[in-house]
Amino acid sequence: MFTDKINLALKIAAKAHQGQNRKGTDVPYIFHPVAVGMIISQYTNDEATIVAGILHDILEDVNPAVYSETDMRRDFVKDVSEPKTAGQPKLPWKERKESYLKRLGNSYYIEAYIVATADKIHNLTDILKDYDQFGDKIWHRFNASKQDILWYYRAVFSLIRNEPVPIELKRHLANLIEELKSIVTTNP
């Protein structure tokens, strides 16, 4: 389902993420928000939630001069993104993740949990695929140990577990976390 709003979100994301690549790869970053939107669209046809998935990293990763929270509110009216730290300096990895977990845990928008689940599914899918291809070399692209990365995904899942996120999405994320756990515990 490609509505005018979804098409607008895709255009904005493509422009905002132009020239960016996925961490440690040559894959254009735009693949990630598009994939998150596609994952969400498999479980809901709610336009605002799909748009939120496509735009979910813009406030965190894109210079506000390119696209700001004000622009997002103008273009999409309601707050379509999970809470981000727009315009704030980038904190160390652990502090960023703890802050994200706190904001997500305090969210009362079911859409934020759906977007977070789809985002983590795509991120973990890429991590596991890259691990299969490159082995332990992939951990160097992160500012955290693989044990900390596992901790983070488990913490996100613990927040999502009891929320009304489609059960298939939760199962998918849980299975990916188990795969990551197997890698981390087998090869610490």
Show where each model-derived region lies.
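Active-site helical microenvironments for divalent-metal-assisted chemistry
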Residues: 1-188
